[in-house]
Amino acid sequence: MSARKRRNGDAHCLGCTFDGHGRGRGNIHDPEPIGGGRIQVLTRGPGTRGNICLANWRDLTGAWPPIRIGGTTQDRALYDAASSAYVTYSVADPRDAPMSLTYGPRFLTLAGQYGGSVVVGLNRGRNQLSNTIEAAKRAVAEVGDRLLAIELGNEPEYYDRAPVQPIAQNGWSPDLDAASQNEWHLAVGRAIGSDKMPLMQAGNWNDSPPKWGAAQLIVKQNASVKAQVRTYAHHNYPGGSVRGLLSHAGTSANVRSRFEADVAAVLREGKPYILGETNSVSGGGAADVSPTFGAALWTMDYVLRAVYTGISRIYFHHGTVGNCQYCFWGRYSMGAPYYGATAATAFLAQAGTMTALDDGNGAYAAYASFDASGAPLRLLLFNSDYYESGSRSAQPFVLRGLPAGNAAVRAKRLTAAAGALARQDRGQAPTFGGRTFADGTCVPAGGDVFEEVPVSAAGEATVSVGATEAVLVYLQ
């Protein structure tokens, strides 16, 4: 089978082919690659609307998505074993994150009630190792087998910036951070017994590799430290305008330039590489960018390009409630990016491998997923030409080599009538396969609409994808 996009002179389209009669040649991905992250003080518990939103993805994949409990406040939070409260803090404005807080055992009990895997972020910045060890032991006891990893410190490259964290009072650098990570990973890992089952998530920086990256950390780790490390993580917030985020070439370049070499270094160690915290724009997002349909398509494309690059899981950060423009739910009841994440989840669900069919340098993208036997499972076609209003252009994608005897293939369209700037909170809800997700509940609404795409006797079909749209094609 081949997937080719018709456009005269567009060299980026000419290599978008794969053999529909062979095995999948893409990267093996995590069964639940898309996860959610929440700043520690504001994590929601089971039974909330957030769990309904996550349950929609569980229904696609068969497993609860991974979550990370961490963020800026993890290096401001100390464990209080005597506290009966989930968390204790005060702020002058509910849109602020607290500068200090404590949390008790009930907070970790709550984390253990989630049905999927959990990454727990603990404090390193305050330099109170014994307190962090106590919290880690409680996390192991409460979360149990679902505790995927513990990370010690959030974005530690910023420890020497005002207000300077106690651990960095005498200076800070990649070398000093590496020495600190190694010391703490050994101490915490041995205290909780993870020398028999590695639990540490190393790295967790936001500044760019290689200065702050896994490759430079790995060369400073000995075998004992490496034995404690389960995963290596980095953060990423591309930022920019809606038009910039929507660009497929821009998204591909961002992932490739920042992470390709760092991912390769980690994979050589036989460990997973994680985007432990990411979203469109840092600091909670931008009101005129992060809730839009353009950001939804970026979310979809970004996930798939990351998985193609070898990144196992992508945790989309949900920050302070009331000041979270990029939240998939909560800030705007339903943010448009949830639709993009849902489309990416549907594309990857139950797949064994996936690959990109384009070189990432043009406006048009094609991805293929394969089942466990290597047979083609789905195609995702994306037209990143910018559309906001007026006449909407379209791009035909030609599919060749489809199985003989198929009269048609089914497809779901991800679209918004108002284009890149559409926002559900302004009455411009996107649709995925004709379906919307209800404000405040995430309950799917509307029929599940499949388009029928005719297949010729020669095994060829043409799918028209409008500007600022994507189409998911089902091959089985």
Please name every model-derived segment.
Residues 12-198, 202, 210-217:
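N-terminal catalytic cores of secreted or lumenal carbohydrate-active enzymes
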Residues 463-475:
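Short Pro-Gly-centered flexible turn/kink motifs
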Residues 33-36, 72-76, 123-128, 153-159, ...:
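Solvent-exposed loop/turn segments at secondary-structure junctions
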Residues 275, 279-375:
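Aromatic/acidic polysaccharide-binding cleft in carbohydrate-active enzymes
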Residues 120, 129, 135-136, 170-299, ...:
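Noncatalytic carbohydrate-binding groove/subsite architecture in carbohydrate-active enzymes
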Residues 67, 120, 150, 155, ...:
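Conserved, mostly hydrophobic/aromatic
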Residues 394, 402-466:
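Acidic, Ser/Thr/Pro-rich beta/coil linker or hinge segments at domain junctions
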Residues 359-405, 411-420, 468-471:
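Carbohydrate-binding surface patches
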